[in-house]
Regions:
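Short beta-strand/loop motif that positions the catalytic acidic residue
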Residues: 69, 75-77, 81
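Generic beta-strand/beta-sheet core signal
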Residues: 11-13, 76-78, 106-108
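Regulatory input/activation interfaces that engage signals or partners
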Residues: 21-28, 35-36, 41-45, 51-54
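Active-site nucleophile elbow and catalytic-triad environment of alpha/beta-hydrolase enzymes
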Residues: 15, 48-65
Length: 122
């Protein structure tokens, strides 16, 4: 991890621990959200259970590197996000280093994925 990174502030993308999280998305909606249409039209969702996708997740999923993510985190999510379920954090939050000591989680009520017109006061 680059020592210049002193904190993380991910906004609306809390899809860490991708594989169980994306399966939860499908089960919760009974299919894919309309927002994922470009991905399922290209049949990319078919590969979510493929061993090569598991291999890719091991590289691109920040959850894989959670032991190195020891800096404070402010996670900002939207309660009305079209892409991601608002309970995704249950698949990763408790596994983050210092989850309850140094990290904060904010849910913007009624905000969609674009977050336009919303602000966070911390």
């Amino acid at each position: 991890m680059d020592p210049r990174v002193i904190a993380l502030v991910p906004v609306v993308m809390d899809l860490l621990n991708f594989e169980p999280n994306i399966k939860h998305h499908f089960r919760a909606y009974g299919g894919w959200s309309f927002a994922l249409e470009p991905y399922w039209k290209l049949n990319l969702t078919y590969y979510f259970d493929h061993p090569k996708f598991t291999e890719l997740s091991g590289i691109i999923d920040p959850y894989t590197y959670r032991d190195k993510l020891i800096m404070p985190k402010l996670v900002v999510n939207c309660g009305n996000d079209e892409f991601f379920n608002n309970d995704n954090s249950r698949y990763w939050w408790h596994d983050m280093p210092y989850a309850y000591e140094m990290n904060k989680f904010v849910m913007l009520p009624n905000a969609d994925h674009i977050v336009a017109g919303n602000s966070v006061l911390v």
